[in-house]
């Protein structure tokens, strides 16, 4: 279900403070975050945010096409390697 338009998009406070600080200094550095549920807002464009996928932080460069999406959409949490040849459980009978 989509978030109500009466509410603002969710962005973690600590992440918002770091973005604002970097925008004021006009610096570019990688921001590490565990907040996968934060929405990408226009002030994040041009920054590189390292998003935690459960094992490591994946650096993602934020572009204008990503605005409105969640950070977690760009860092997959699992790595599917395919079914094995002898795996009869997953085969269709």
From Swiss-Prot:
PANTHER family: RIBOSOMAL PROTEIN S19P FAMILY MEMBER (PTHR11880), SMALL RIBOSOMAL SUBUNIT PROTEIN US19M (PTHR11880:SF8)
GO (cellular component) term, any one: chloroplast
MF (Gene Ontology): rRNA binding; structural constituent of ribosome
InterPro entries noted in UniProt: Ribosomal_uS19 (IPR002222), Ribosomal_uS19_bac-type (IPR005732), Ribosomal_uS19_CS (IPR020934), Ribosomal_uS19_SF (IPR023575)
Keyword RNA-binding: yes
Record-linked NCBIfam families: rpsS_bact
Function: Protein S19 forms a complex with S13 that binds strongly to the 16S ribosomal RNA.
Record PROSITE patterns: RIBOSOMAL_S19
Pfam families: Ribosomal_S19
Keywords, sorted A to Z: Chloroplast, Plastid, Ribonucleoprotein, Ribosomal protein, RNA-binding, rRNA-binding
Stated name of the protein: Small ribosomal subunit protein uS19c
Record localization: Plastid, Chloroplast
HAMAP family: Ribosomal_uS19
Family statement: Belongs to the universal ribosomal protein uS19 family.
GO annotation (BP), single: ribosomal small subunit assembly
């Amino acid at each position: 279900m989509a978030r109500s338009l009466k509410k603002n998009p969710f962005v973690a406070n600590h992440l918002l403070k770091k973005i604002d600080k970097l925008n004021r200094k006009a610096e570019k550095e990688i921001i590490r975050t565990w907040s996968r549920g934060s929405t990408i807002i226009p002030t994040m464009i041009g920054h590189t945010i390292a998003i935690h996928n459960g094992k490591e932080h994946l650096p993602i460069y934020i572009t204008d096409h990503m605005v409105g999406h969640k950070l977690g959409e760009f860092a997959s949490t699992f790595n599917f390697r395919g079914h094995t040849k002898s795996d009869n459980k997953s085969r269709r009978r």
